[in-house]
Amino acid sequence: MKQYISHLKRYRQFAELTQEELAAKVGVRRETIVRLESAQYNPSLKLAVDISRAVGAPIEEIFEFPMQGGIWP
C-alpha cells in the first residue's frame, strides 16, 4: 500500500527535466527517481528538499500524504 501520492513526474516534466537530469541534479540514480515517481520509495528529508528545489515546487505538492480517518498515516 502506498503511503503517499507522488506528483513528482508532473513537476519534473513541468520543469522540463528528464529523469536522468533530475537524478544528476539531486545526486541519485535514475532508478531512484523512477521509484519516487511511482511512490515505491520514501525519500529522506534531504532528498525531498533537493527535489523540491530542483523542480521549483513545494515538497507538500510533490509528495502528498493524505489523511486517513483524521490522522496522518
Regions found by a protein language model. Give the residues of each.
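A short, Lys/Arg-rich alpha-helix, primarily the initiator
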Residues: 1-14
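Short alpha-helical DNA-recognition segment
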Residues: 17-34
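DNA major-groove recognition helix of helix-turn-helix/homeodomain DNA-binding modules
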Residues: 46-61
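Alpha-helical residues within the helix-turn-helix
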Residues: 13, 24, 53
